[in-house]
Regions:
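Glycine- (often His-adjacent) and acidic-residue-rich active-site loop
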Residues: 25-68, 87, 117-119
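Short glycine/proline-centered loop/turn elements that form peptide/ligand docking sites
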Residues: 89, 107-114
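Gly/Ser-rich catalytic serine loop of serine hydrolases
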Residues: 81-91
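Conserved CoA-thioester-binding segment of acyl-CoA-metabolizing enzymes
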Residues: 1-24
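Conserved catalytic cysteine-centered active-site region
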Residues: 68-81
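N-terminal glycine-rich phosphate-binding loop for ADP-containing cofactors
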Residues: 4, 42-45, 52-55, 61-62, ...
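Helix N-cap at the beta1-alpha1 junction of Rossmann-like dinucleotide-binding domains, i.e.
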Residues: 28, 108-110, 323-325
């Protein structure tokens, strides 16, 4: 806890026999960030109290941490951070409070301030020490505003750490700084400190800040309080001494924590995601289902994307389409993705070939034998879906899961075409599959809890985020999507200028404007969905 850390630091500082302190972790990560549910650090439990008292509690708690880190900086003893693994969020802010930072030379290690990704701002000096070390550049603003992590080498070139070394030499390198009489004072505490790159009121600084403000407004439409607070904290803080700057950061941190938008982001993007990774919503009474082979019916854009992310997880894929050329084209989708990664040195030829070897493009349904899961990804047409369902179920075992990637058609109705409706479930991916993290799992009227558990195990294996929803036309996401894009088209028909419609959509917090989104998903798809919906309503007498 923070209290235990404070007690240890105070003892080390007061012990005259201690000439310097090396901070390292006994775990694989140095520190991968603070616990965002910690009331000691963030005070989320106090937000529900009287607003003034809550703000005071959060501010005072934050300043306690700020003062603790300042005591390290001003102790007169050199502190060295030996970064053996990920140093993120508060973990990296501890490093920033050290006088020297040495990291293992490993590109898999992440160094960064990812708080903005979950709606918060660095709250232990990150907005003040980072720019004092590295200046305010486009790269550094991305580091803070977007939470983009650096590798140790990149952090070194940016000026955020002082040295990279081999794992075996990490502690020796850290000790060497102390033994060699390394400074025990931070640059900003030295007389004559000059801010790297120029302050905001210099000509160069004015250009940087004007561009940063404009870019932030363009990308966020002021919907994200954390990014605005980070920019303000840096702008104001770099113009005053460090102690005043840390108080500025603490005030902005308090303001952000008190903001309902930030609280919602923390809940959705951190707390709930942590719960999902631990099996929330998964039925508890069933063993883990290890999917080793799946069949994908339909090798179009969606089916091809599903094939890629599934093979990437090490699962064998049988990719079926009406003719061999179409199936081969579906596999080619994965080839193109991997070739692009290869050109950027994000994969190797060996890894590429291994992934592609897992995808078998074919027209032969008999190759589905032994599949643990089927994903149907054909057009939104009931007749076609019924046909491929029958062909696939004739080949698979009675325990295999059959999932439909339908975006709008009720699962209970589609399950009527199945010989085993208890094993039938909706698995709705989003395009492009390799980039979109969400998968919607839809429970039909007869879908069993075991089928739900198996499906959630598969979705987590391919590293997607599952949400479980009830069965109704459009489910959850497509109903939101349809309403959003439909309203945009309706406004256009009423004569409202497209630019106004698009800006209004972005101002609501949506990542893409409604008319642009309609174009991106293809208007013919909307027509097919509408046509099938009309047929269904007529059949139901509606």
């Amino acid at each position: 806890s923070l209290g235990e850390y404070r007690s240890i630091i105070e003892k080390l500082i007061s012990d005259e026999s201690v000439k310097g302190i090396v901070l390292r972790s006994a775990k694989d990560a140095f520190i991968a960030g603070a616990d965002l549910t910690s009331s000691e650090v963030f005070g989320f439990d106090s937000v529900q109290e009287d607003k003034v008292k809550a703000a005071e509690k959060i501010y005072n708690g934050n300043m306690d941490m700020q003062l603790l880190f300042r005591s390290m900086e001003t102790s007169g003893k050199p502190f060295v951070a030996a970064i053996n693994g990920h140093a993120l969020g508060g973990g990296f802010e501890i490093c920033l409070a050290c006088h020297y930072r040495v990291a293992i030379d490993n590109d898999k290690i992440q160094i960064g301030q990812p708080e903005a990704k979950v709606g918060l701002i660095p709250g232990a000096g990150g907005t003040q020490r980072v720019p004092r070390l590295a200046g305010v550049t486009q790269e550094i603003m991305g580091f803070l505003l977007a939470g983009t992590p650096f590798t140790p080498k990149k952090a070194l070139s940016a000026g955020l750490i002082n040295e990279v070394t081999d794992a075996d030499n990490l502690i020796n390198a850290a000790k060497k700084y102390i033994v060699d009489g390394g400074k025990s004072v931070q640059p900003w505490d030295e007389k004559g400190f000059r801010f790297p790159g120029g302050l905001p009121y210099t000509p160069k600084g004015a250009m940087i800040w004007a561009a940063a403000s404009s870019s932030l407004r363009k990308n966020s439409y002021n919907n994200y309080p954390a990014q605005t607070a980070i920019l303000s904290a840096v702008y104001e803080g770099v113009q005053v001494p460090i102690d005043a700057a840390l108080r500025i950061e603490a005030r902005y941190f308090t303001k952000v924590v008190m903001d309902p938008r930030s609280q919602n982001m923390v809940r959705s993007l951190f707390v709930n995601m942590q719960a999902l990774s631990k099996g929330a919503r998964r039925p508890k009474d069933f063993d883990k289902y290890d999917v080793k082979k799946i069949g994908i019916l339909g090798a179009g854009l969606m089916g091809a994307g599903i094939a890629y992310v599934t093979a990437k997880a090490g699962i064998e894929v049988v990719l079926i389409d009406m003719d061999q050329a179409a199936a081969e084209k579906g596999k080619e989708y994965s080839t193109k993705i991997l070739d692009k990664q290869l050109s950027k040195k994000k994969t190797t030829e060996e890894k590429k070939e291994k992934l592609l070897s897992l995808i078998t493009p074919t027209t032969d349904y008999s190759l589905l034998k032994g599949a643990d899961l089927i994903v149907e990804a054909v057009f939104e047409n009931r007749d076609i879906k019924a046909d491929v369902t029958a062909k696939a179920e004739a080949q698979i075992s009675e325990t295999a899961v059959f999932g439909s990637n339908t975006s709008t058609l009720p699962i209970t109705g589609l399950a009527q075409n199945s010989s085993r409706p208890a094993n039938f479930i909706g698995i709705h991916y989003f395009s492009p599959v390799e980039r979109m993290p969400l998968v919607e799992i839809i429970m039909g009227k007869e879908t069993s809890q075991e089928t739900l558990a198996k499906t959630m195990d598969y979705v987590q294996k391919i590293r997607k985020t599952p949400i479980v929803v009830n069965d109704s036309r459009g489910f959850y996401t497509s109903r939101v999507f349809g309403t959003y894009t439909g309203e945009g088209v309706a406004m256009l028909a009423e004569g409202i200028k497209p630019a106004l419609i698009e800006n209004a959509g972005k101002m609501t917090g949506m990542p893409m404007a409604p008319l642009a989104l309609s174009d991106a998903v293809a208007l013919d798809l909307a027509w097919k969905v509408t046509t099938q919906t009309k047929k269904d309503f007529e059949a139901e007498g509606k």
